[in-house]
Amino acid sequence: MSKLGRAARGLRKPEVGGVIRAIVRAGLAMPGPPLGPVLGQRGVSINQFCKEFNERTKDIKEGIPLPTKILVKPDRTFEIKIGQPTVSYFLKAAAGIEKGARQTGKEVAGLVTLKHVYEIARIKAQDEAFALQDVPLSSVVRSIIGSARSLGIRVVKDLSSEELAAFQKERAIFLAAQKEADLAAQEEAAKK
């Protein structure tokens, strides 16, 4: 880049206005990346945003991922719209897992019942994205079943505690073997 181009880039004003969409963890908004630089480019006070967001989410369990819209106004003030937790958070919580499957379709990371899916759908149907489009509950349920499938979570009609315990034991053995294989692969790569 020429000296003139660099000088011109240095003189540009920061972007003002617009909407920033992000998933921010409840009570854990911090001025660092990835949110800090995006807000800084728009001229928004990062510390003020973090303070306001953390204050508004203090009643929610810390660490829950919340879809957030930040409406930046031309005078560099902002308005925060906080949505409900993500579908993947609800599904992973219902299945009792931390991560989805590595290879969806080939492995099952967890199990949820149709009752779980229905309860999640009732909560998410109130979400702005579904409510504005007047989406029927059956469509929300299908959407959540699709999300579960993409996470490697199997939706079953009924699930007894014995079946769940057997699945969790089997899954723990599978994850331990997977971790062992990963460590062996890392050691092999380090030797090369």
Curated annotation (Swiss-Prot):
GO terms for molecular function: large ribosomal subunit rRNA binding; RNA binding; structural constituent of ribosome. One of its GO terms (cellular component) is mitochondrial ribosome. Keywords: Mitochondrion, Ribonucleoprotein, Ribosomal protein, Transit peptide. Disulfide bonds: none annotated. InterPro entries: Ribosomal_uL11, Ribosomal_uL11_bac-typ, Ribosomal_uL11_C, Ribosomal_uL11_C_sf, Ribosomal_uL11_N, Ribosomal_uL11_N_sf. It is found in: Mitochondrion. It holds the Pfam family Ribosomal_L11. It comes from the Eukaryota. The keyword Transit peptide applies. SUPFAM superfamilies: Ribosomal L11/L12e N-terminal domain, Ribosomal protein L11, C-terminal domain. SMART domains: RL11 (SM00649). Coiled coil: none annotated. GO terms for biological process: mitochondrial translation; translation. Component of the mitochondrial large ribosomal subunit (mt-LSU). Mature mammalian 55S mitochondrial ribosomes consist of a small (28S) and a large (39S) subunit. The 28S small subunit contains a 12S ribosomal RNA (12S mt-rRNA) and 30 different proteins. The 39S large subunit contains a 16S rRNA (16S mt-rRNA), a copy of mitochondrial valine transfer RNA (mt-tRNA(Val)), which plays an integral structural role, and 52 different proteins. NCBIfam families: L11_bact. Belongs to the universal ribosomal protein uL11 family. This is Large ribosomal subunit protein uL11m. It comes from Homo sapiens.
